[in-house]
Each structure stands twice: as C-alpha cells, then as structure tokens.
Amino acid sequence: MKRKPAVAGLFYPSRRDELVEQIRICFLDKRIGPGELPDPSETKLQSPIGFVSPHAGYIYSGPVAAWGFLEVAKFGEPSVVVIIGPNHTGLGRPVGVWPEGEWETPLGTVPVNQRAAEIILNSSRYAEEDFMSHIREHSIEVQIPFLQFVFGDVSIVPICLMDQSPAVAEDLANALTKLVAEFPSVLIIASTDLNHYEDQRTTLRKDSYIMEAIRNKDPRLLYEYLVKEDISMCGYGGVATLLNMNFKNARILKHATSGDVSGDKLEVVGYLSAILF
C-alpha cells in the first residue's frame, strides 16, 4: 500500500524544488539552524542511534530539526529508520505499525522495511498492523523529506502511538532491542514537540525538565516531570522508548521555540533536537 502525503503544502512545500530549497534554508539558517549543509559519511552506520526531532511546520521547527539530521549524517547511513510519532488524530490502533508498501513525498517514495516491521510486530505485546492511524498523521511524515535530503534512498518503519504509557515505551524498547540484533545500524527517530501554547519563560522552564530527563537517560524522570510540571509534550512515548534502550550517551543539540522564529513570545511551542548513542 502506498501512503500519499497528508501535509504537503501545509507543513512543508508540495513542490519538489521548493521543498529542497526549504530544507536547504533550514540547514543554512545561522540564527536557529546549524548554518551548514550535511556532508553524509560514506560509511554505513555502525551502531544504533536515537534522535529526538520536532515535527511542526518547517518554517518553525525545521532549523532545529536540521541540527539533528546534520549530526546523524556524520555517523553514517542507516540500514533502516524507525520513526515513532504521536497520534494527533485519534484514528487507528493504540500502537500502529505501518507494515509494508511505501510512503510518498514530493521528493519521491521511500519503502517500508517489511522485515524490520515484522520483527517489531512479533516482538511487541502492543504493536499492531495499522494503516488508519497514519493516514492523516503529520508527526512521522515531516521527518521523511529530511531523511531523503540527507541519505537519498532509505527504508523506514513508521510507528504511531496513541498509547504512550510507560508500559508501551518499555515494551517498544524491548522490541527495538531485538530489531537491533538483525539491523544493528538502525536509526530511531522519536518525533515530538515539547511544551505547547504557554509563554516563552514558562516553556523554557518546562522544556528544561524534559532535557534534564533526556540527559540523564531516565524514562521514569520524564514521566514524573510531565505530570508534576504539567508539561504538554506531545510525543513523550517515543522519547521514553529511546530512554529505555540503554544508550550510553545523550547529547542536546539545539532547543528553540516558535517564538524565536515568529517573535510572538506569549504562546509558543518548544522544539528540540537531541541524539542518543
């Protein structure tokens, strides 16, 4: 089954040339972005990498996302990319894995790695084959043009989470650990924005707690802060999955808010790029 783009022309340009230029602008942005284009390693990725990436419209979160894609490119090309995104639509299964076929963007199509999807489905108590949760969801889709820009051909496994409980995060981490046994060069993207629609000062404070949990690689601390500090982070389940995977290192690459782009600091959304390796 081929998934057509749901948010081309909304979150990013629908024309190929305009999309390529928009992604270039995100990388070359020197105020919020890294100010340089990626130079992918000619080698293959040697070990698993986790990547926390934002998923708003490219003009807002693209420069922050570019920091992560720039860094990931230095590690080498992955054999498969698992993209875990939160379910914003309420459609589909609690943990929906797109099992086969391909996803289309204005830059072309990327295949779903059927074998990798099969391993995850067979290793998880919660994951189910599901197309409906993905049809209108943007959080996974917006990562793919960046992947195509950096790596060209790459295969993916999209996972959409309506259930982002600690039990699901731990279960998915175990399933992905089994995936690593067959696909050691996997890149796992946790797609999330951080605190939503509060003022800049409040969002910077709340987002700092999320970054602390990531630096400490502590999923329990992440969930504690979400409740204690009332943080409206949308994709915490994917991040908690990464934090359950026993990565040795975690590095914050860039944090900014929508207010840093628009100048409106009264209601902002927080964006983060971080890697775990």
Swiss-Prot record:
Lineage top rank: taxon: Bacteria
InterPro entries: MEMO1_fam
HAMAP family: MEMO1 (MF_00055)
PANTHER family per record: PROTEIN MEMO1
Sequence similarity: Belongs to the MEMO1 family.
Name of the protein in its database record: MEMO1 family protein Tpet_0837
Organism of provenance: Thermotoga petrophila (strain ATCC BAA-488 / DSM 13995 / JCM 10881 / RKU-1)
Organism lineage: Bacteria, Thermotogati, Thermotogota, Thermotogae, Thermotogales
